[in-house]
Amino acid sequence: MLEKEKKCIGIIFGGESNEHDVSVSSAKTVFKALISKTNINRFWVKAFYINKHGVWLDNDQSLVLLKEKRKNETIDKNQVFPKREINFLNTIEFQGIDIWFPLLHGVNGEDGAIHGLLKFTQKPIVGGGILGSALGMDKILMKKIFSHLEIPQVNYLDIQNQDLSDDKVKNNLSVEIIEKLKLPVFVKPANSGSSLGISKAKTRSEIIKALQKAWEIDSRIVIEEGLDVRELECGIIGNLKLTASEIGEVSYSTDWYDYDSKYSMDNQIIIPADIDSQISEQIKDIAIRSCRALNIYGFARVDFFLEKISNKIFLNEINTIPGFTSKSMFPMLWNASGLNIDQLVAKLVDISSDL
């Protein structure tokens, strides 16, 4: 079939965030799915890689990165978009793209920034819109909305507009945290993913170190009570009608589910999770309600805590561009729900066309 008879999917990946490498891995998975035997007669792909300095590579070099296993960022300066080009969105490289598939995890991607940029092209975008992406990325705003809607969450505090370069400020905050929350606590940057910048703190001195670590990533910080929980996850796809996947559980050998354990070979993924059917249905219901509350559509992964001692469900967070790596839960959840990776990626493209 001629390319002009297929839909051209524009993949954007890489980026300046600290989740750059995860984005590259996700893009490789999606690219392979789009050109698989299942989808080769429906789609063809243009790709645009953004390096860690914010420089865009053209389609030819970006496709090389997707097809090869190399990690270097050799750049031919004749094949890079000028960073401040006035006619950026009208460049010939973008012509012919029917649907965008952004796979930028973290800041400038998952926070809705890339969606805002691509909206000017007036082409459909796979995934959520600007508002839902921004709210899903920002843990403080997300939690305030969920509190208003009485969606269950662990107890938390948020820190904003504080100069944490001042040791006195950190000391005072550590005292307040211990007074208001039960130890241990988790200290998180408000806008970060893949557990980057997150620390578990059991003592006041550890809280001070954790505040500094989080503040180096984001000036807005969330502190949550650390309960003894199971980590459960649910996939969501759809627009007006949202559909929930099977529930999955991550079992890990480390003290908590940090960045290294998320991409470790030692994790055990259990799908469906060994939970009561009533709990499973409650999680699916909360996942759908929470996405609707934040105006999230297209696809998302919703993460939950299930307290071991009480079986209470707590919503943790929503990921509006979940990973598509070989170790990512989102495609595994949908595979267990009847959609293999090729079918899932095609489904997400079709959903974007219906908006």
From Swiss-Prot:
It is found in: Cytoplasm. Its EC number is 6.3.2.4. Its main location: cytoplasm. The keyword Iron-sulfur does not apply. Mg(2+) 2 binds at residues 317, 319. Keywords: ATP-binding, Cell shape, Cell wall biogenesis/degradation, Cytoplasm, Ligase, Magnesium, Manganese, Metal-binding, Nucleotide-binding, Peptidoglycan synthesis. ATP binds at residues 178-233. Mg(2+) 1 binds at residues 303, 317. GO terms for molecular function: ATP binding; D-alanine-D-alanine ligase activity; metal ion binding. It catalyses: 2 D-alanine + ATP = D-alanyl-D-alanine + ADP + phosphate + H(+). GO terms for cellular component: cytosol. Cell wall formation. Belongs to the D-alanine--D-alanine ligase family. This is D-alanine--D-alanine ligase. It comes from Prochlorococcus marinus subsp. pastoris (strain CCMP1986 / NIES-2087 / MED4).
